[in-house]
Amino acid sequence: MSTIKFLRSSTHNALRSSLGWCRLAASRPRYDYDLVVLGGGSAGLACAKEAAGCGARVLCFDYVKPTPVGTKWGIGGTCVNVGCIPKKLMHQASLLGEAVHEAVAYGWNVDDTNIRPDWRKLVRSVQNHIKSVNWVTRVDLRDKKVEYVNSMATFRDSHTIEYVAMPGAEHRQVTSEYVVVAVGGRPRYPDIPGAVELGITSDDIFSYEREPGRTLVVGAGYVGLECACFLKGLGYEPTVMVRSIVLRGFDRQMSELLAAMMTERGIPFLGTTIPKAVERQADGRLLVRYRNTTTQMDGSDVFDTVLWAIGRKGLIEDLNLDAAGVKTHDDKIVVDAAEATSVPHIFAVGDIIYGRPELTPVAILSGRLLARRLFAGSTQLMDYADVATTVFTPLEYSCVGMSEETAIELRGADNIEVFHGYYKPTEFFIPQKSVRHCYLKAVAEVSGDQKILGLHYIGPVAGEVIQGFAAALKTGLTVKTLLNTVGIHPTTAEEFTRLSITKRSGRDPTPASCCS
């Protein structure tokens, strides 16, 4: 069967089965459960709770395999425990350190000559918050009548799940009409000597007991850049090793601006470089050997910590998907538009699925919509287009829609107009902060009402700025509407309503003042 036929037929079957669920529910108990969810992260929990709210009998399995250095965590998945939440808290901690220095310029009597964070206290505070979220999550599952088992679960067949309730206990089995796989992913390690034994990942850094010190961050995706930036803001010495380009998949101009901002702030980059080995020295520090792939020259340097941020892999190896007949691509699960796998009653949501944005809000909404289709008669599918995202660096980068390169590739350079400009945040003037990289642009169609295809912004609180514009873009925002919108002054978000200079014009996009 061709891929297109598979997608069409499985989507149709998934929607047809969801519409018929209410009629079939009266035939219980053919299976032990109506829904078994594998994975207690954002997608799995959202799906499980929504399904239970629709009257389904739901069982959720969640299990965290410790990292090579022994890090483990509770229910909630990557976002709560080792992703979005601790990352944002560390980001905030680093911004507060910067704010202390700015406070002096604003008239506060603060001794900013010896500002230094207490790493252990910060980690303890972050972990205490995470544990409170773990507890609230468990209580929420109980209140919503979702059964929860903290155990690794695998497929016995397409309707049967096998698990061990506790180490040494006998294997148990449960059956379910539907199964949703939402096990997410974990960071990759490079296949080089010392990588696993001596390095850590984002799974470890937020609970790391000792100060990171001089840190080599290997990888220049958003995880690597965010970690490097909050470490720098907390007073440590990160270096970023880049194999090829920073922020692959993002707009190139914006990505390069972000890297330039980081360089200006004292974060060095090792460009076109790959690690070859990590060795522990007699003093306990780590010797990293590497090679520049452009010059073919070998080099080495010594660090206190090596953090791998070279991408993530789906956790499919322990699921026994072959027993269920579920098809995969690399380490991800292939699904159709209704999140159905190659087995019509088995679905997948979240980071485990192939070719979809790996973002928490995407996982949550797709999980809820799937539950509604299965148990509430809904036919609404998840719309994966034009999803906004933010890179939480000191000047944040947020975007929604197409990059400039994608727009040109899909529409042609002659059919694209790019409105752009630098700007000067008012609050930057008194502490004399650099505004060199505060920049935004709108990628639009050149003709007609000039529908906007993508919005990009580097600056303070980028996520807060772009969120509202994301809704506008989804509803067909045009350049005319944008420029006819009265901005809120003085804010950085209003800069989008003042975008009058196009790249094609060749005019200087640098403003003369904060109000020009």
Swiss-Prot record:
Species annotation: Drosophila melanogaster (Fruit fly)
Signal sequence residues: none
Recorded catalytic activity of this chain's protein: [thioredoxin]-dithiol + NADP(+) = [thioredoxin]-disulfide + NADPH + H(+)
Entry keyword annotation includes Membrane: no
Family the UniProt entry places it in: Belongs to the class-I pyridine nucleotide-disulfide oxidoreductase family.
The name this protein goes by in its record: Thioredoxin reductase 2, mitochondrial
SUPFAM superfamilies: FAD/NAD(P)-binding domain, FAD/NAD-linked reductases, dimerisation (C-terminal) domain
Gene Ontology cellular-component annotations: cytoplasm; cytosol; mitochondrion
Further comment: The active site is a redox-active disulfide bond.
GO molecular function, one term: thioredoxin-disulfide reductase (NADPH) activity
Key words, A-Z: Disulfide bond, FAD, Flavoprotein, Mitochondrion, NADP, Oxidoreductase, Redox-active center, Transit peptide
InterPro entries: FAD/NAD-bd_sf, FAD/NAD-binding_dom, FAD/NAD-linked_Rdtase_dimer_sf, GSHR/TRXR-like, Pyr_nuc-diS_OxRdtase, Pyr_nucl-diS_OxRdtase_dimer, Pyr_OxRdtase_I_AS, Thioredoxin/glutathione_Rdtase
Subunit structure: Homodimer.
GO biological process: one example: cell redox homeostasis
Required cofactor names: FAD
Primary role: Thioredoxin system is a major player in glutathione metabolism, due to the demonstrated absence of a glutathione reductase. Functionally interacts with the Sod/Cat reactive oxidation species (ROS) defense system and thereby has a role in preadult development and life span. Lack of a glutathione reductase suggests antioxidant defense in Drosophila, and probably in related insects, differs fundamentally from that in other organisms.
Pfam families on file: Pyr_redox_2, Pyr_redox_dim
Residues noted as binding FAD in the record, renumbered to the chain: 62-79
Co-factor note (free text): Binds 1 FAD per subunit.
Annotated catalytic residues: H489
Localisation per UniProt entry: Mitochondrion
Enzyme Commission number(s) from the entry: 1.8.1.9
Disulfide bonds: C79-C84
